[in-house]
Amino acid sequence: VVRRAAEAEQAGTPALEARKLARLFVTHLHSDHTIGYPDLILTPWVLGRDKPLDVYGPNGIDDMTAHLLEAYKQDIDIRLSGLEPANDRGHRVNVHVVEPGEVYRDSNVSVTAFPVRHGDLPAFGYAFTTPDRRIVISGDTAPVPELVELAKDCDVLIHEVYSATQFAKRPSEWQAYHAHMHTSTRELADIARRVRPGLLVLYHQLFWGATDADLLAEIGESYDGKVVSGKDLDVF
């Protein structure tokens, strides 16, 4: 995450300079979504962040944070007590365990968390509302009515997806898993028809041999709105 943000900063988005990364909204605690969390705690601090990181996430984020800070205790202590000019604030974390509803607000944006369905793990999506935009991020989820209601007529819907065509070729045990945990291209087309976002951005794509063009074609069979298959560092 930090390295992608640094690339974005170098490409012309100064707000994503590493030392300015001060807030994190976590959808759920699967390892593929949190493996970069310690990097986001520590690297911006090493690069000059001088205030705690504010983290918002589901139940369990507090324990995960405490364990990570304990795991890196020796590194933190050496940086604070040795020759490195490290401050005593930027490695700290303010943890906010979220419930459905507004979880953050400042003069620029409000953030609303809504529950999604990703197996038995507590999971959320987030809606970001500014004076002139509303952007909704699904997180990992099977179709849920809460997302449809909250996202209606949003400017951008960023939603996970898997290829329905390639899903049919998966082993039965994996079909059962993915059908319960994720959203197919056909299901997402139905969601998009009801939401009518200004732009639908696909992310967390499960291709299984499909291409970006294949995903777009599958969705385009029953949805005629604007759709792109997102990549890191895309700007819309």
Residue positions per predicted region:
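Binuclear metal-dependent hydrolase catalytic cores
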Residues: V1-V136, D214-F236
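Cap/insert and terminal regions of metallo-dependent hydrolase folds
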Residues: D132-R134, A142-D234
